[in-house]
Amino acid sequence: MEFKQPNRPSYCTWELNATNSPHTCRTKNGDYTKIMPDILTAIGQTPLIKLNNIPKSYGIKCEIYAKCEFLNPGGSVKDRIAYRMIQDAEDKGLLKPGCTIIEPTSGNTGIGLAMAAAVRGYKCIIVMPEKMSDEKISTLYALGAKIIRTPTEASWHSPEAHISVAQKLQKEIPNSIILDQYTNPGNPLAHYDQTAIEIWKQCEGKIDYLVAGAGTGGTISGIGRKLKELSPNIKIIAVDPKGSILDPSSDSQNEVGFYEVEGIGYDFIPTVLDRNVIDKWIKTEDNESLNAARMLIRQEGLLCGGSSGAALIAALKIAKDIPEEKRMVIILPDGIRNYLTKFVSEYWMETRGFLQPVCQNEMNKWWWNMKISNLSFDKQSLLKENTVTCQEAMHMLKNADSQLLVISDDNIHIKGVISLNKLTSYVISGIVKCTDFVDKAMVKQYVKVKHSATLGYISRVLEKEPYVIILDDEHDDAFIGIVNQFHILQFITKNGTSNNYLIN
């Protein structure tokens, strides 16, 4: 099967200040004061809200306004492009009654497409990496979409990645179509025709800076192009998370890695991203971005998502040098609904080191301040990469006390974990074959805890996590073992009297 590149050269002929646009224009005509024919008509016309408390606390003099895209009916900025791509496909005769829409996505485009598919009567299959939140999955299921998960660690062009899996499905399913947000001109055009115009009118033509996260690049490219046409002096600021390569700086190309913030950043350059329209790139990190999102919620009452925090952090970094008479607009792409079990949860933030743990021994438990080294647990054997097949791994897991296998490339440091549930799911869904090496089903994101941590801290982490990986902080984070709630319970019941255990 020929792989369709999501980063192939763009054929767009748009030029700044051209007399005529080469594209079909779709303006927004919905009237919110009247009855609407369906929910899709309600997409767009999101409010522009002034930030007050946060700029004041940071000593920012310029005005900062937030475009609240999370107030779209599907909960994100991606509602706009989903509807636009469907409209364009229908007009071209590519999407007809009975068709199935397939889309590789980080979730929000999928939700927008599933919502539109529900209204229009199409079937919908969404292919998304496992990193994405359970809340997005639940929303997609509620809208009637089918969902296929792919390994987060898979590189964008690998057969296991969401793009390849979607293309494979499209070949197998009759009357199916991939609208392909990475290359579809309707992605940036939705923002060129509507979002940018809304911002311009809301600001009454007075806007000096636009700050937005870059994912597929459609949002910032479409808005940026239109605003540059309307006012050439506007500065377009793009936000790229550390671990992504969208920022064209030389360092960024060697920084490909995992990051928690969803919906922005990629390990390839999507076709629809026009980096020429961007004046400055700001790199952001998970810690600052997710805490900034919590700050937007707590201090401004804006129920936004994690990538909104990245936009805020980028804005604050440049706003400190911007004079009082200037005006900045930031895009808040999605909302809190998608992340209730992620950055909204203090447990989740603590276990990833983004918040200082709150470990108070309120019940005066005798074991609370004891070290992990007091626990009795077996160190799992470390398996070499590319030595065990999925079939062999399933057999090993079924016959072992542990439900986990540990992969290492040097027999000292852990590279990833294999769980029976995950491996079985991958085999059943066809993501991996029984004859594949088990590394393809390896999980690289897990909670790591230092050997010097207390049992109280571990017990708090294990309230939400099924297990934690213990590393030796005195010996270059060498793998020590895996601890779950059973190990702590076993220690308590073995070393404390039954009365003491019950009372404390």
Curated annotation (Swiss-Prot):
Entry superkingdom: Eukaryota
Keyword Repeat: no
Residues that, per the record, bind heme: C12, H23
One GO CC annotation: cytoplasm
Location of the CBS domain: 375-434, 442-498
Enzyme class: lyase
Enzyme Commission number(s) of this protein: 4.2.1.22
Residues that bear N6-(pyridoxal phosphate)lysine: K78
Signal sequence range: none
Keyword flag Cell division: no
UniProt KW keywords: Amino-acid biosynthesis, CBS domain, Cysteine biosynthesis, Heme, Iron, Isopeptide bond, Lyase, Metal-binding, Pyridoxal phosphate
Pathway linked to the protein: Amino-acid biosynthesis; L-cysteine biosynthesis; L-cysteine from L-homocysteine and L-serine: step 1/2
Residues where pyridoxal 5'-phosphate binds: N108, G215, T216, G217, G218, T219, S307
Gene3D superfamilies, sorted: 3.40.50.1100, CBS-domain (3.10.580.10)
Transmembrane segments: none
Family: Belongs to the cysteine synthase/cystathionine beta-synthase family.
Subunit-structure text: Homodimer.
Name the record gives this protein: Cystathionine beta-synthase
Origin species: Apis mellifera (Honeybee)
